[in-house]
Amino acid sequence: MAAALPRTLGELQLYRILQKANLLSYFDAFIQQGGDDVQQLCEAGEEEFLEIMALVGMASKPLHVRRLQKALRDWVTNPGLFNQPLTSLPVSSIPIYKLPEGSPTWLGISCSSYERSSNAREPHLKIPKCAATTCVQSLGQGKSDVVGSLALQSVGESRLWQGHHATESEHSLSPADLGSPASPKESSEALDAAAALSVAECVERMAPTLPKSDLNEVKELLKTNKKLAKMIGHIFEMNDDDPHKEEEIRKYSAIYGRFDSKRKDGKHLTLHELTVNEAAAQLCVKDNALLTRRDELFALARQISREVTYKYTYRTTKSKCGERDELSPKRIKVEDGFPDFQDSVQTLFQQARAKSEELAALSSQQPEKVMAKQMEFLCNQAGYERLQHAERRLSAGLYRQSSEEHSPNGLTSDNSDGQGERPLNLRMPNLQNRQPHHFVVDGELSRLYPSEAKSHSSESLGILKDYPHSAFTLEKKVIKTEPEDSR
């Protein structure tokens, strides 16, 4: 699959390096992860570089990593190797977003007018070659040999091209300085104000916890160590109000890139190294005796650097992403198939909370429903039992009254005695005042039909008189027994 063409100057630089290393298959991965800054790859430490390799999927292929490292070294030492033009990529398609304020593209003036007024401007104002190439095309072919090919470096990245001819990296628009090499001190290696302020805050917090140094011990040490005394002895003799004292402290407190170190020319300090140097300088300003204890100074400076680098880079990245409305090429890429895990966790938490509330509501309603069901069952059971008990009592009472009135011996037992002999659940209170239903019906009929009352009542009484005799008269039968055996 062919890699996408670069659209910005940073992407073009990355494209050239990957093309040189035959690693164009990683171009899209670098762009997706915001890796269009080649300078970041060159200045990255070992851990940061390995992390970048893991992000683009190159960490598992060490041979590819070695080829990329070699291409980066060649890009720093010999940028002319990366000046091959892209035939399918027009120069006008590369936006210039790092031009200085005095450049003709920024000011909106023509190249010819800018050339006429260039003598009145800053003589060393420099712009990338892509802008210079456009200007040369409008001026004619007479000056086309001055500009070689498309530049790979912008003004902010010019420090990586020190010691090389300007035709290889960038051109000066001043006619007097065409072809002059870049100055080694073109960009000062120093932290910005925000990072320096963060270092100062950390030093202020740490200073009270440091042990106080004895000035007499420092003087004794300088007396015994003549070399050290010759180097930094004059700093202890300066007054605190001396404006040159801090400058001398910064000169001799530097951990990385000190004036007497054997650092390779062209290799610049990274952010970590600059932070360590700044922390060491501010610590020595607080306590000059730390100049004589570089091991302790280095440990303290590294501790401050770790804290400052993390906080400052996090704050800077967050502020830049918050202030920009347009899409940044260095923003963290979020895959479509992998949504943000925080949103997923929030959704799961809300679902779990809704489920817990629903279960709590069901648990609170469940006892009420169970009690209602139990009460309904008990009520129905009790009503059914009461109904059965009432029916049994009524039938027993009617049977007793009928048997007493129509007894064959004509004897009526006392109601109170009969009630006393019966169990409590079978006793019928006020049995004397209660009449069977058929007696009430007979009374009503006799009142309504007096002519037929006698015959009807006599028939009814005959039936009632015959019923008890047949129901309760027990005929005694003698059971014949066999004689006993005399044997």
From Swiss-Prot:
The modification Phosphoserine is found at residues 172, 183, 328, 407. Residues 409-418 have a biased composition (Polar residues). Residues 221-310 are annotated as: NCD2. There is a cross-link at residues 333, 480 (Glycyl lysine isopeptide (Lys-Gly) (interchain with G-Cter in SUMO1)). Residues 307-338 are annotated as: Necessary for nuclear localization. Residues 162-188, 399-434 are annotated as: Disordered. Isoform Short is found in myeloid leukemia cell line KG-1. It is found in: Nucleus. There is a cross-link at residues 126, 129, 143, 212, 333, 355, 369, 373, 454, 465, 477, 480 (Glycyl lysine isopeptide (Lys-Gly) (interchain with G-Cter in SUMO2)). It holds the Pfam family SAM_NCD1. Residues 4-82 are annotated as: NCD1. GO terms for biological process: endochondral ossification; myelination; negative regulation of DNA-templated transcription; regulation of DNA-templated transcription; regulation of epidermis development; Schwann cell differentiation. Keywords: Isopeptide bond, Nucleus, Phosphoprotein, Repressor, Transcription, Transcription regulation, Ubl conjugation. GO terms for molecular function: transcription coregulator activity. Its main location: nucleus. One of its GO terms (cellular component) is nucleus. Acts as a transcriptional repressor for zinc finger transcription factors EGR1 and EGR2. The NAB conserved domain 1 (NCD1) interacts with EGR1 inhibitory domain and mediates multimerization. Belongs to the NAB family. Homomultimers may associate with EGR1 bound to DNA. This is NGFI-A-binding protein 1. The gene is NAB1.
